[in-house]
């Protein structure tokens, strides 16, 4: 039986004035897929991810989440937005983002950060949200002592693990990771990648923008190489890394794998 389609992005474009950043990018993620998006800085990777959950408004394209077509209309600037605010709210509970710079609320404790969205967006009681938050904080290795601290008192690796717990607490269909290790000191990268690998092994559906070629090669089920806003090459990791066809991808990997 074919796996259930969790996310389908069709022919996504993004323009800023006359400059086209995304030139028709498509992606299909089935349940349990781990899709890594690689490419040079400025290739459109993060913009693509942000357009998927409408932190950026795409210019053209269609997005289907769990078989449900997202109803899009044009805003006054000609960009696409979700027609129904309730559908946008639902979309963001189904596709949760882990950001490069953590984006934790500085005035809330670690535990409060993870409880907030389940209470405000999902309507959970404080008791249920607390139980859920404790479960996912334990999953990412944040102990009780750290749970009462404010983000400023945590290492970057701990903050990013809290950010992952916060995304997991929404129990989404797809986890979106936007370069989750690029703001970390090198010695802290491994602890975050280990959590992500564990999530992949548990069958979580993930779309990951990353510069971590080891993760992309060994954990992904599918790899997309973006170049100048287009998919230059894609395939399974062994194909993309072991036998790249595009000269641009060959050059990129030569530089990345030194």
From Swiss-Prot:
Protein name: Histidine/lysine/arginine/ornithine transport ATP-binding protein HisP
EC number: 7.4.2.1
Subunit comment: The HisPMQJ complex is composed of two ATP-binding proteins (HisP), two transmembrane proteins (HisM and HisQ) and a solute-binding protein (HisJ). The HisPMQ-ArgT complex is composed of two ATP-binding proteins (HisP), two transmembrane proteins (HisM and HisQ) and a solute-binding protein (ArgT).
Notes on how activity is controlled: Isolated, soluble HisP has a very low ATPase activity. ATPase activity is slightly increased in the presence of HisM and HisQ, and strongly increased when HisJ is also present.
Lipid bilayer topology: Peripheral membrane protein
Assigned protein family: Belongs to the ABC transporter superfamily.
A Pfam family of this chain: ABC_tran
Gene this chain is encoded by: hisP
Compartment(s) of residence: Cell inner membrane
Summary of the function given for this chain in its UniProt record: Part of the ABC transporter complex HisPMQJ involved in histidine transport. Is also part of the ABC transporter complex HisPMQ-ArgT involved in lysine/arginine/ornithine transport. Shows ATPase activity. Responsible for energy coupling to the transport system.
One cellular-component annotation, GO: plasma membrane
Species per Swiss-Prot/TrEMBL record: Salmonella typhimurium (strain LT2 / SGSC1412 / ATCC 700720)
Gene Ontology MF annotations: ABC-type amino acid transporter activity; ATP binding; ATP hydrolysis activity
Upper taxonomic lineage: Bacteria, Pseudomonadati, Pseudomonadota, Gammaproteobacteria, Enterobacterales
Residues annotated as binding ATP: 41-42, 44-47
